Regions:
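C-terminal alpha-helical interaction appendages
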Residues: 1-71
Length: 71
C-alpha cells in the first residue's frame, strides 16, 4: 500500500475523532487537523506519521490543542 492510500484509509478515523471531541463539522475538523502540526506532518511522507494509528495521531492533535489553550 502506498503512502497516499494509507493516509486515505486512516484520515476518516482521525477526522471522526476530532468531530466527536470538539463537536465540529467534517469540514471544520479537516481544517483544524490540516492546520495543526500533526496534520502537516501527516501530509509529509518524510515524517512517516502516516504509518501510525489514527488514535496515536489524534493524541498528538489533542496534545497540541491543549498546549494552545490559555491557562
Amino acid at each position: 500500500m502506498n503512502h497516499a492510500t494509507t493516509r486515505a484509509a486512516i484520515l476518516p478515523e482521525i477526522i471522526k475523532l476530532i468531530q466527536a471531541q470538539y463537536g465540529l463539522s467534517e469540514d471544520e475538523a479537516l481544517h483544524a487537523f490540516y492546520t495543526s502540526a500533526p496534520g502537516a506532518s501527516f501530509a509529509d511522507d518524510e515524517t512517516g506519521l502516516y504509518g501510525q494509528s489514527p488514535n496515536y495521531i489524534f493524541g498528538l492533535f489533542l496534545q497540541e490543542q491543549r498546549e494552545r489553550e490559555p491557562q
